[in-house]
Amino acid sequence: MIYTEEQDRIIEYSDLDALYFFRLDRRLNMKGKARSHQKNYFKDFMTMDIETSVQGRDTDQPISITYSIATYIDGDCILCRTWEEYVDLIGQMSDTMNLSKYNRLVCYVHNLPYEFQFMRNYFHIDEVFATQARKVVKCYTKGVEYRCSYKLTNMGLERFTSSTPTCKHGKLSGEEYDYKKFRTPKTVLTPRELQYIYNDVAGLYEALIYKMNSDDHDVATVPLTSTGYVRRELRQAMAQNPANRRNFIKTRLDGYLYGLLRQARLILYPKKADFVNTF
């Protein structure tokens, strides 16, 4: 165990054992599950954030080194120092909690497109939903469904946590943390640096809990993006009049016209033709 400047506890990966995962599984099951589109979700969720250092910052080929992968779940902050440790952490959680395609744990990341570029080198990604090249909104692997909380809130983490009344762990100053300092997985982190890491995942968790409760949502019903709220309200409003559905069916595109529009779009925007292959 290690402790932050404010004495918040962080569990190091090396402190974990099989008993911890069984206890975590029991605690999460006691909180219940939610169902959506033939999938079961644990009602509680996890948050994750990574910290990296850049080697060769002033060269043509800088290299990013991950030295911290922190997660927060059910009041516990778990710190992995390498991706290999994180892969093993998720593997043990998946096995103990019987995670699968139809029994999922949600993990929110506040800049998922960035973390995704690292994750794809260590995990087999089974599902990806993106709005455009490198703009990942959601992905799935090993029973864990990762979602981008920035797309949900449309706010930076500092603004999101500071605007949440019940958030106790707001994001700390990036200038004070000194991103230019070179750190590796073997670097001994100071209590202040640990506080920065802790607040990022704990604060995000606290802010998301408040948002979901305020909006009367859970992980199964909350939209993926901030615009999802608007689309949902529109669908509900349109459903009030049965004639709207009939008019929609009457004016919808047929396969031939849809094909023509798709072809025209590819001609106008050739670089967006197959953006998924750029991951």
Predicted regions and their residues:
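Conserved non-catalytic scaffold segment of RNase H-like nuclease domains
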Residues: 25, 29-35, 41-46, 50-113, ...
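N-terminal accessory regions of nucleic-acid-interacting proteins
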Residues: 1-46, 50, 272
